[in-house]
């Protein structure tokens, strides 16, 4: 029997995560944890409780995924990830069957790779990251923990996206450049960054 997975955070990103989890077909979604009870029955899945209920939910469930989005700040995702981890939840890597991840790439716990994303050879993606729909992580690129690479963004070879950063839709980083921590790269922009030493 497939293990049950709880989703932490309702809303638009959660809907996209549900679709990927259903398509991957490795977990059964038990329900959603959110501070807003009105999200009950999101795409047919029940509301399980508030963030404060996670300790009790751990008695029944082993797996959790952070499904709240990230644009301006990673703070909420980081807090929830660390809290779930401290309670002993396992935070799996979720990969859409429509994505391509090289067998030579590495992905950290709690990261989700959405439909039609591509992660190439020897790329490294940290924990609790969103690799969103149609994004490209090229060879030898590094995406540190708690980053969101948004829809259609391109991280070229050898680039480093520092922890907590957001790269907007259709933004492009040049090869072998480095962002700052918690950087915000605007949608559609070309990021020239600083050359790696």
Please state what every model-predicted region is.
Residues 1, 26-28, 60, 88-90, ...:
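Short loop/turn motifs at secondary-structure junctions
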Residues 1-42, 55-58:
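Hydrophobic, well-ordered beta-alpha structural blocks that scaffold small-molecule cofactor pockets
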Residues 9, 68, 175:
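Small/polar loops that bind or transfer phosphate-bearing groups
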Residues 12-13, 72-75, 106:
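Short alpha-helical
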Residues 18-20, 77-80, 125, 197:
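Short amphipathic alpha-helical segments
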Residues 39-96, 100:
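Phosphate-bearing ligand-interacting subdomains
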Residues 93-197:
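Structural signal for interior beta-strand "rungs" in well-ordered beta-sheet cores
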């Amino acid at each position: 029997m497939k293990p049950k997975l709880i989703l932490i955070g309702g809303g638009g990103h959660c809907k996209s995560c549900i679709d990927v989890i259903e398509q991957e077909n490795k977990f059964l979604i038990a329900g959603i944890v959110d501070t807003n009870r009105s999200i009950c029955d999101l795409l047919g899945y029940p509301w399980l409780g508030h963030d404060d209920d996670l300790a009790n939910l751990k008695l029944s469930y082993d797996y959790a995924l952070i499904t709240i989005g990230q644009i301006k700040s990673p703070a909420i995702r980081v807090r929830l990830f660390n809290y779930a981890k401290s309670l002993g939840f396992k935070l799996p890597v979720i990969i859409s069957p429509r994505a391509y991840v090289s067998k030579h790439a590495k992905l950290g716990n709690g990261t989700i790779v959405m439909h039609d994303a591509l992660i190439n050879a020897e790329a490294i993606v940290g924990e609790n990251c969103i690799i969103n729909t149609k994004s490209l992580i090229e060879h030898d690129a590094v995406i540190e923990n708690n980053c969101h690479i948004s829809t259609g963004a391109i991280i070229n070879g050898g680039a480093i996206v520092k922890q907590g950063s957001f790269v907007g839709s259709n933004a492009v980083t040049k090869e072998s450049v480095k962002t700052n921590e918690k950087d915000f790269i605007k949608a559609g922009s070309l990021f020239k960054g600083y050359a790696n030493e």
